[in-house]
């Protein structure tokens, strides 16, 4: 603080940038002191939301703004990538959108950078900050989440996975804590299930997506690169970058069988994207090669009885089209590269 004050020598505006402020003991006091310097514009950065978003926003409510920086979107990535869009797509879904990746020339350098970033930054920060004693347990959970992106799960289900696959007992309470640590460190994001017709959240199962797919792939040694699951994660990230709150949708339908017994069936909508009074229902469908697959992907959308836009994103490089139910099908490239792609 003394160092900063000594350099503010006149009435001109000074810009103070403090990186990883959460590493400074009693950083609230430092920021409070700087708030009284009228000609200082202070920018604080950090890689752990628990010690920034929760503490700083609460402490300095009304006296500052929070900006959440994401890795590069695909369109931003392509502005720095030298090559065609499909080569860029393969590069992006393999090595992710951290800006430094664009400056590395070989696949080996990119993979080493991402592995080191996870091991020496993410993992160390999470373990030390939260005093996690069982590194192997936490690390294994991160890999399980990485290998099952887009799959509904909860702490109890993950605890059972540890028991059945790894023959290790990890309590659901411990897993819930570990997941929250990953979220606070911006490693993953949680998307909660939402009953569209019932207009309420369902807290039984959620989905987790990686903020950067390069980190996700590095966790798995660049194996398990199922393009369909990765595409779903990329669409989720794109929606978040565009400022949408994203839930996993569920449509419930009740019918009766020939014995007049009630049958309850659930249909999933990959994403319910909300922003103000706007809402979009979005399906990630890697391919729809035949009528059966098309019926499968549209089944949940046709059962939603409101007027919000319904979109299916496919990997095929197609012209956007709209069917008789008003459902728009659009290719992944148009969806990611056109800023108004959701308004077709």
Which sequence ranges carry the predicted segments?
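Short glycine-rich substrate-engagement loop in P-loop NTPases that contacts/grips substrate
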Residues: 1-15
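Structural recognition of the conserved hydrophobic beta-strand(s) that form the central parallel beta-sheet
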Residues: 17, 41-47, 68
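Conserved catalytic/switch belt of AAA+ P-loop NTPases
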Residues: 28-44, 58
